[in-house]
Regions:
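Conserved catalytic-core segment of NTP-binding enzymes
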Residues: 36-120
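Short, flexible coil/linker elements and helix-boundary hinge sites characteristic
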Residues: 10, 120-122
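Phosphate-binding/switch loop-helix module in NTP-utilizing enzymes
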Residues: 2-44
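Conserved beta-strand scaffold positions in the cores of enzyme catalytic domains, especially
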Residues: 125-127
């Protein structure tokens, strides 16, 4: 987690610096990605999760998922949290690298695609193929 990485370094995450850096990039570029890792409920600090940061800054979200066991549950829980917080969902990226079983992969992808089309009709589903 971000919190653990900061603790290991003996530092605290400076959100004002992150905000200032983001603003600087937004002045220079049309699109800026602020990347998190580990999910929406990863702690940045004891009192702040990634989803809190996204919500408070009104950042549009691109959610990344895959076909691993449990990913339907993880993805739907994340999407429900996004909806409850009123966060704008731009896209869901489906990473096919973890598609080890074609039947399970097709079912997982299909379920997520149907869910998004019903609950987030303006959201794009983007497939990332395996690159050899």
């Amino acid at each position: 987690s971000d919190q653990l990485a900061a603790a290991i370094e003996g530092r605290e995450i400076d959100l004002a610096l992150v905000d200032a850096s983001t603003a600087l990039f937004l002045e220079r570029y049309d699109r800026v990605l602020v990347e998190g890792a580990g999910g929406l409920m990863v702690p940045i600090r004891d009192d702040l999760f990634a989803i809190d940061y996204i919500e408070s800054r009104r950042l549009p979200l691109v959610l990344v998922t895959n076909g691993r066991l449990g990913s339907i549950n993880h993805t739907i829980l994340s999407l429900e949290a996004v909806k409850a917080r009123g966060i704008e969902l731009k896209a869901v990226v489906y990473n096919r690298y973890f598609d080890k079983d074609s039947v399970i992969a097709a079912d997982t992808h299909g379920f997520i695609e149907r869910y998004i089309s019903r609950h987030f009709p303006d959201c794009e589903l983007i497939d990332i193929p395996v690159l050899n």
